[in-house]
Amino acid sequence: MKIIFVFALLAIAACSASAQFDVLGQSYRQYQLQSPVLLQQQVLSPYNEFVRQQYGIAASPFLQSAAFQLRNNQVWQQLALVAQQSHYQDINIVQAIAQQLQLQQFGDLYFDRNLAQAQALLAFNVPSRYGIYPRYYGAPSTITTLGGVL
């Protein structure tokens, strides 16, 4: 009799644990289905509310206009691109450091003008191939190397 009672308790505990896992699984799936923009808006919602309360702009017709909503969406898209562009800037920095190290390491032993030209060409073409550009706005007219000007 005691064994049956113990098995009944174990069965009840297993059923309740299974129900809890189902609820957790459903909430996790809903979390995964939410768009990143919606998640960003949920994170920033308390801050938006604070600004509206602080400055009393909740009833402003501009904030509810279609032009404002469009501009707001554009700002969110631009913010998403900032992280991507900073990644490309890091690539440019690594390329410049690698070139400096190569020149320091091999500059005294020998100088291969063709290699330097190929590296310079690569340094200018790689960023533009991926749609990213270094800090200057146009390509410089000359490139100075150890052997002279390219």
Curated annotation (Swiss-Prot):
Signal peptide extent: 1-19
Modified-residue entries (Pyrrolidone carboxylic acid), positions: Q20
TM regions (residue ranges): none
Keywords of this entry: Pyrrolidone carboxylic acid, Seed storage protein, Signal, Storage protein, Vacuole
InterPro entries cross-referenced by the UniProt entry: Bifun_inhib/LTP/seed_sf, Bifunc_inhib/LTP/seed_store, Glia_glutenin
Molecular function terms from GO: nutrient reservoir activity
One Pfam family from the record: Gliadin
UniProt cross-references to SUPFAM superfamilies, sorted A to Z: Bifunctional inhibitor/lipid-transfer protein/seed storage 2S albumin (SSF47699)
Main subcellular location of this protein, as a coarse class: other
Claim: Signal is one of the keywords in the record: yes
GO cellular component: aleurone grain; vacuole
Cellular compartment(s): Vacuole, Aleurone grain
Other comment: Lacks significant tandem repetitive sequences.
UniProt function note: Seed storage protein; serves as a source of nitrogen, carbon and sulfur for the young developing seedling.
Entry similarity comment: Belongs to the prolamin family.
PANTHER family: PROLAMIN PPROL 14P
UniProt-recorded name of the protein: Prolamin PPROL 14E
Organism: Oryza sativa subsp. japonica (Rice)
